[in-house]
Amino acid sequence: MKTELLAPAGSMEALKAAVSAGADAVYLGGAAFGARAYAKNLDEQEILSAIDYVHLRNRKLYLTVNTLLKEEELEEKLYPYLRPYYEQGLDAVIVQDMGVLKAVRSWFPDLDIHASTQMTVTGSAGAHFLESLGATRVVPARELSFAEIQKIHRTTNLEIECFVHGALCYCYSGQCLFSSLIGGRSGNRGRCAQPCRLPYEAYDKDNHRMGELGDRYPLSPKDMCTVELLPEIVKSGIMSLKIEGRMKKPEYTAGVVSIYRKYLDLYEKKPSRFRVLPEDMKKLYELYNRDGFNKSYYTVRNGRDMMALKNEKEQENKKKQRRNEQLFYEIQRDYIETEAKEPISGFLTLYPGQPAFLSAESGKYSVTAEAGMVEPAKKQPLTEERVKTQLEKTGETPFYFKELDVCMDDNCFVPMQTLNELRRGVSDQLVKEMTEPYRRKAAEKPEQEAKASGKPDQESGAEKKMELTASAETRAQWNALLEITEITTIYAGMGCFKREIFEEQAEKGILQAKELGKQVYLMLPHVVREGDLKEYRDTFRCLKEIGLGGFLIRNLESFSFLKEMGMEKDIRLDYSVYTYNSRAQAFWQEQGVQRDTVPYELNEREIGKRDNTNSEMVVYGYLPMMVSAQCVQKNLNGCNHSYSLVRLKDRMGKYFPVKSYCTSCYSVIYNSLPLGLVKEADEIRSMHPAAVRLNFTIETLEETKEIAAAFAGTYCKGIAVPAGREYTKGHFHRKVE
């Protein structure tokens, strides 16, 4: 399969520039549902025109629907939004939401579905699961190495698309709530405000400032540039090379595409001569960079060299530098002012007494046109040169004559208008012939479709007692939760039991909890990379046999791993396996999972309309804002593999805890204040969740005891939580954009 160069298009001008510069395909967002809601984007008519524009040039167009959709958006707006694009010939849709994937498969069964990087696919098991659902392509997490990507390539038939150039998020895509929680602008809804690019001071557990002088941007990665890695990228099984930048100007898009096109072609034609010239690296640098470039995660796990820690100084230096006007002039001239055209071969015959006749061919397409009658020349006969000059004025058509043969009488004449008619005739016919195969007719949206049932009946919902559950990440928290009688289930993080004697300690813990009338579920990591859970396969089976209730999972990789073991009915979903809408809920119910977790970004009105009878709702806990492969501890003070807890201080003086999870090599940034839905207990009861949950992450044993007892009193006995602690309400009372 030919390697595809995939370019961003935030506008029609950028799309045309990308195609002119050599992109094989473009991806863009429309008026809704895209992950770059603040890009200019294209309206419906522009997208319909864009679909034909790329198809006439033998390219492809993919539409982003890579956000999480709320109920009314999915049920009322998505079908009419997608239908005209589908019927025009849209090549694929890029999705994040399982409800959207389910709907698109139902409504448009022959439309290719690309699983967005927002799905946080981190291994072959997750990729294989998406393939089984009908996805044709996967965009795995940017954090994966060549070896991990090769495993996906070897074990699935999916096309693999990876980012090769542009901005790099600090967080695993799809796992970021930072912008949402501090400002209401959700990255999962395409409205990220990029708080990660702001300055922060880092402090260790002893309150010492971390890092070198000037390390003020610990969450801001450099842009990625992997043109020098193209041979390794192609060999790894990546078939689509994706350039980031729908918010960027057309000059940036065209400039970057042209350089990657040059070197991709060079490698495919003469791999032994592959070498990137310094002047081309300089051009990429001048088009845009952030403290220089990194080569993404393909060959490294993380590290200081990937970060733009001193970004402010670099930006000051940039302001003093003059833009390379010659570079931008050349890009404007070659790719923006000059549109890509498809070559055609033409054959013209002009003989007196016969109609003027022109045939044209483009690939497998062949058309003909006739116009007027050729007359004997009364004065000056037409010359072949004059005829060719007129016909080759293809203007705004998508074609140019690569070859034009003329067979004509030496003494003939036709008006220039006749030649124009011939040219228009073959051009219009070719356009129709080349776009018609892409057209298709959508079926009407089905009246009845499988979804979660909606809000349950008040009385039937009230019959079932709401449980109190809690999660623990440390042994101290575990011990504290065992003492709280009202807690029926404990979700034990892997850190609750020592790795060296994990099975032994976990078995004792399960039996101990059982004696106290509690169930235990293992809470699996936020991120599971290739092979992370392999060593636990036999352990999980043994623990199930002695009474383990099941597993609380945070990602597709964990689900797929357990599904392969036949344990899908022992699974509960955490918040990060999103169930924003009833179709997503129904999808996971069909997969056999026991419960989901109410998404943190839904507000009280939206939760109230939801069927929560198989859902848990988190009412206490420090909410995770970022899950990252990077490590503040390592990047600023060096790796100590000690599960460090550091704090980031923002410009407003707020402190955000950052916890390292060294066994799985990732870190989590938590909100500055814990969620505490205290006064909302009665309202939450009326929403009929199966359980409310307390999440403990950084709390001490004493704090865990005190908080768990207080919330147990409120939710189980109606006792008010004592004043004294400060909480946030999260999104319970405010809507995300």
Where in this protein do the model-derived segments appear?
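Glycine-rich, highly charged phosphate/nucleotide-binding loops
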Residues: L42-I47
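Active-site PLP-lysine loop of aminotransferase-like
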Residues: T122
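A cross-family signal for key residues in well-ordered alpha-helices
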Residues: K102
